[in-house]
C-alpha cells in the first residue's frame, strides 16, 4: 500500500454547486492555476455534459494546467462520457469520473431502475470510458446508504472493466467516522480484485463530520485518495475541507503515516481567492484559514506562545501561507519593489500590462492610505486579475455623495458604458442604497440583489473595505467584488463588476450532483 495520499480537489465542480457560487470560465481558470501551484494531484474542473460553459472551462483548463491531472465528471452513459473525453483532449494527464446511484432509495425513486440495470450500466460506462483513458474513476452515488452485497458486486465489476479509482460517496453526509471507515475497509476486504484500484473517499458535511469521516476512511479503511474542496465549499453544509485534511495529515504524520505533496504555503492565498470569487466569507474561527486560526487572546496562552510557540501552536501560521500583518510598502516605493514583494508573496500576474495596472492601483491607494499591508497588495492584484478577465461593458469612474441628518442620502455615480460616460443620480435609504439606485437608474438591469457584504482587508480606520455583491436575473446568479478605502466606492465597484458578469454571454449551469 502506497504511503502517498492523493488530494483530489473538486472546488470547481462540487464546490460550484453551492447556491450562489457559480463561476465564470475565467474565474475557474484562476482557481485552477492556484490549485496547480499548490500541487494538487487531481483537479475536477467540472461536469462537461452539464453545459457548453462547463465544457469550455474544462477544455481550457486541460490545455493550461500541466502539473495536475484534470478530471471531468460524467454520468454513467455514453453521451456524458464522450463529452468528458472531448473536453479533456488537451490535458497532459486526464481522468474521467463516472457515477451512478447504488442505494435502494436512489435506484427506486430517482433512477427508477432495478439493481441489475444499474449494475449493467455501471459496468458498461467504465468499459466505454476506458476507450479514452486508462485513468477512470467510478463513484457509487449514495454509497454509504447502499446494500453492502450489491455494492461489492458493482465495484468488483467496474474494477474488472478497468476502473482505477473507486470513490465511496457519502453523498448526503449520513456517515459517522467509525462506520464509514469500516465500510471502506470491508469493501476492500470483500472485493476480490480491490487491489487493482485505489480507494477514495468523498464526504459531505451535513452532520459536521466530513473531515472526520474522510480521515476515518483513510486510517481505518485504507483509502488513499480524499476528495475535498477549498474552504469546504459545497452545496448544503459543504464538502470535506482540503486545508483541514492536508494539515491534519501533515501535522499528525505520526498517526496517519502518510505523505501529501501539497505546497501548504499556498493554502491561505487560494482560500482567499475562492472566498473572493464566490462571495462566501470564511468564518473567523475556521480551522487553518480563518482569521482567528492562529490568534491567542488568553493571557496564559499569549505568555506561553511568547516563551515557546509550540506550547499552544501545533502548526506555524507561515506554513499555511499566513503573512505577518506588517507595513511593507509606501507611496515612495517603486515598481521594482512592488514586483519583488509580489514574488515574495507567491503572487503572479499573467502579463506586464496586468502588472502595470496593478502598480498604478497600488500608487493610487498609497496616496490615500498611509500604511500598505501585504493583504492590501493581494487584494489589489486579485481585483486587477478579475478586471483583466471581465468583459468590461461597464466601468466605474467616480462617485460623490451627500448626506444630512434627517434627509435621505444622495449619490452621484459616473461610469462608462462601452467607453461612453454616463451619470446617474439617486436617493436611497443609505449611501449604498442611493449608489445602487443611481447605477440601476441608468442601466435598468432588472436584477435582484441577493447579497451585500463588507469585509475589512486589514485593521484600523484606514483599512480597505472589500465588498461582495450578488445579483440574480432570470435564474442566473453572479458575484461582483470591489475594494476601496471608501466603502461606498467599493460598493459601486462591486455592483458594476456584477453587472459586467450579468452582461457577459457565458453559458453556465450549475451541474447536478454526483
From Swiss-Prot:
- Which keywords annotate this record? Amino-acid biosynthesis, Branched-chain amino acid biosynthesis, Cytoplasm, Leucine biosynthesis, Manganese, Metal-binding, Transferase
Organism, by scientific name, is: Burkholderia cenocepacia (strain HI2424)
Top EC category = transferase
Positions that bind Mn(2+): 14, 202, 204, 239
Quote the EC number.
2.3.3.13
- Describe its assembly: Homodimer.
Q: Which InterPro entries match?
A: 2-IPM_HCS-like (IPR050073), 2-isopropylmalate_synth_dimer (IPR013709), AIPM/Hcit_synth_CS (IPR002034), Aldolase_TIM (IPR013785), LeuA/HCS_post-cat (IPR054691), LeuA_allosteric_dom_sf (IPR036230), LeuA_bact_synth (IPR005671), PYR_CT (IPR000891)
Its protein name is: 2-isopropylmalate synthase
